[in-house]
């Protein structure tokens, strides 16, 4: 296995990659900005000043559409806070503070309604294609049965069925590659015809 053309190195992967879990583990009593500042203090190099940390947090909040809720608490089951989509964005922001080259997301749309899920994936699409070279990040995410609009945001796919790869390659060629194996393929919702039992 190789990473950036060199033999795989776990320390190098940790340096260049971020990982966002399906379930968030956020402190519901902190605001969005406090959560990101706390993470910045823990994860950014010690050479960063408080002003530089604050600038990075502000950039991440702007990139993820969180600036308008910077002073809203994350929330708890007993105290209302930000929405589920915003919680997911905060989790992503915590990983983006380091400006990773590679970001893994486990089921980022889980628990979100279709509109919020689409909005979140559109944000990921913008991040992946980068406003600048320094901010561009390769995003790898696992998603079960994406709606057609979400499916069309992906560049490349690996499609699994019963633990086996049935397609790997560009999204634009996926329907041709898979229709060879499956005749009842829906064009509107590309992978809804696959059985996951």
Task: Report residues per predicted region.
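Hydrophobic anchor residue at the start of the ABC signature
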Residues: 91-93, 120
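A short, proline-enriched helix->beta-strand linker immediately N-terminal to the Walker B motif
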Residues: 96-101
């Amino acid at each position: 296995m190789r990473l950036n053309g060199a033999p795989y190195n776990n320390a190098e992967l940790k340096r260049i990659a971020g990982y966002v879990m399906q379930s968030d583990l956020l402190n519901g009593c902190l605001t969005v900005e406090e959560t990101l500042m706390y993470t910045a203090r823990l994860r950014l190099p010690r050479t960063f000043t408080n002003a530089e940390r604050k600038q990075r947090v502000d950039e991440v909040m702007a990139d993820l559409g969180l600036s308008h809720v910077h002073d809203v608490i994350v929330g708890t089951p007993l105290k209302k806070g930000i929405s589920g989509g915003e919680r997911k964005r905060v989790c992503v922001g915590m990983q983006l503070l380091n400006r990773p080259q590679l970001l893994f997301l486990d089921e980022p749309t889980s628990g979100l309604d279709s509109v919020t899920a689409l909005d979140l994936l559109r944000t990921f699409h913008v991040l992946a294609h980068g406003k600048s070279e320094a901010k561009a990040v390769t995003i790898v995410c696992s998603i079960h049965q994406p709606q057609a609009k979400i499916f069309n945001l992906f560049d490349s796919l690996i499609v699994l069925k019963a633990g086996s790869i049935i397609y790997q390659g560009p999204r634009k060629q996926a329907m041709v590659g898979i229709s060879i194996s499956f005749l009842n393929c829906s064009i509107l919702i590309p992978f809804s015809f696959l059985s996951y039992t």
